[in-house]
């Protein structure tokens, strides 16, 4: 059975069939799902999903795109929600310079990234990192915090080079692998997956985004994760069953969701 470590079932893309889709997960080989907040508006939606579905867990945090909207009250709410039994991580948090080119924007993102990492450290929770076009700054901040003592975490939708992957792996962190690994042109990620130990990989969708082949361009869901597991298996010369088993154990260990 598969654990999806990063999903967004609160997204409006699921408004028409959320209930039916989630109720089909077990028969589709999906055992557990972590619904990850990205905005303040998603906090209560994630809580509702956690409370309604026994197999849905949560991660609470603010995506870097919304860093400029964060206040002290936002951070207090993240801390409060992190105390819930099924809230298993702080995320998704990090840096995204793709649309944010100005140094002032970078400074705001870094400040809020650090503030949320502080919560993860103080509450002894793992983190889920979003990083886009911000490889060096993300790595430097994460390294600083890991040296200061952190529970661990996942680099979500890992997209950088094998060399950067090696730095995260040396820190004991996990790489989140999703649909992109099935794309023909994803040479850099395929090299990273071949290099990284299976013991430091977890499966994720980022749904409704990043659907794997053969469903690329369509709405993604956790039911597509067997395609991701198969792609990883082929790159590593092992079975998809081994990928599913080991990544499930990795997620259970990091996120504390043994049952």
Each language-model region and where it sits:
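Mid-domain alpha/beta scaffold segments of enzyme catalytic cores
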Residues: 1-259
């Amino acid at each position: 059975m598969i654990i999806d470590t990063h999903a967004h079932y609160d997204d409006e893309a699921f408004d028409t069939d959320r209930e039916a889709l989630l109720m089909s997960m077990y028969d589709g080989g999906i055992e557990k799902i972590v619904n990850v907040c990205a905005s303040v508006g998603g906090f209560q939606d994630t809580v509702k999903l956690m409370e309604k579905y026994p197999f849905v867990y949560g991660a609470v945090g603010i995506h870097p795109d919304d860093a400029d909207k964060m206040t002290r009250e936002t951070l207090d709410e993240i801390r409060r929600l992190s105390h819930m039994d099924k809230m298993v991580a702080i995320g998704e948090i990090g840096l995204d310079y793709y649309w944010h080119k100005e140094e002032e924007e970078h400074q705001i993102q870094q400040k809020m990234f650090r503030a949320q990492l502080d919560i993860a450290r103080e509450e002894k929770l793992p983190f889920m990192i979003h990083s886009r076009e911000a490889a060096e700054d993300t790595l430097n901040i994460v390294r600083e915090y890991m040296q200061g003592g952190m529970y661990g975490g996942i680099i979500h939708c890992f997209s950088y080079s094998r060399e950067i992957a090696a730095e995260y792996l040396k820190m004991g962190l996990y790489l989140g692998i999703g649909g992109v690994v099935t794309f023909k042109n994803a040479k850099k990620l395929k090299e990273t997956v071949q290099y990284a130990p299976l013991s430091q990989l977890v499966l994720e969708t980022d749904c409704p985004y990043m659907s794997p082949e053969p469903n690329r361009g369509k709405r993604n869901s956790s039911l597509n994760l067997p395609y991701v597991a198969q792609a990883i298996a082929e790159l590593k010369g092992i079975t998809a069953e081994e990928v599913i088993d080991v990544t499930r154990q990795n997620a259970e260990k990091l996120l504390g969701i043994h049952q």
